[in-house]
Amino acid sequence: GQGSLAYPGLRTQGNLETLGGPNDATRGLTSLADTFEHVIEELLDEQQVIQPSKENKDADLYSSRVMLSSQVPLEPPLLFLLEEYKNYLDAANMSMRVRRHSDPARRGELSVCDSTSEWVTAAEKKTAVDMSGATVTVLEKVPVPKGQLKQXFYETKCSSKGYAKEGCRGIDKRYWNSQCRTTQSYVRALT
């Protein structure tokens, strides 16, 4: 399709034949970059269906922060990466002048508070609070036909170092007090 890839400023076009010269074995195969772009576009289209509507309030609880896996994932959730890619595509549709002024790298843009994100297993997070305020036990392992899957949560917390104790960035400390705090959110999980 039209558009850019996940790597800003890089757009690979054509197929393996045009990229690597004529070769009967690769004739007609699309490039890996074009295939990747197509898969991302399909996932973004599917994500649009999941977006909450006024009629479906349960969709508000949809979250990519919970995963069932045989081991703790090493990378952030796919939907976070898709959101970053979608934001890049949205920025690519702006005019060059607007994009130049909104590009974080050009303005030295920083987060208001430093944070760290990591996967935490249910073995480390044994209890949680449900939407009615009751404390519930989090299911650590889920039995499946070929063994067990562990339940893992992707948590983002305020960083213990940096500006958390000194207040938030961009706040005039002469007139305002500020504090970075980790907030709680609800996700769908097995309890």
UniProtKB/Swiss-Prot annotation:
Disulfide bond sites: C113-C180
Keywords: Cleavage on pair of basic residues, Disulfide bond, Glycoprotein, Growth factor, Secreted
PROSITE patterns: NGF_1, NGF_2
First-listed, main subcellular location of the protein, grouped into a coarse class: secreted
Residue span(s) of the pro-peptide: 1-100
GO molecular function: growth factor activity; nerve growth factor receptor binding
GO biological process, alphabetically ordered: cell surface receptor protein tyrosine kinase signaling pathway; modulation of chemical synaptic transmission; negative regulation of neuron apoptotic process; nerve development; nerve growth factor signaling pathway; neuron projection morphogenesis
Record's GO cellular component terms: axon; dendrite; extracellular space; synaptic vesicle
Cell compartment(s), UniProt: Secreted
SUPFAM superfamilies (alphabetical): Cystine-knot cytokines
Keyword match Aminoacyl-tRNA synthetase: no
Glycosylation sites: N93
Region entry Disordered, spans: 1-23
Reported function: Promotes the survival of neuronal populations that are all located either in the central nervous system or directly connected to it.
UniProt record similarity statement: Belongs to the NGF-beta family.
Protein known as: Neurotrophic factor BDNF precursor form
Originating species: Anilius scytale (Coral cylinder snake)
Name of the gene encoding the protein in the UniProt record: BDNF
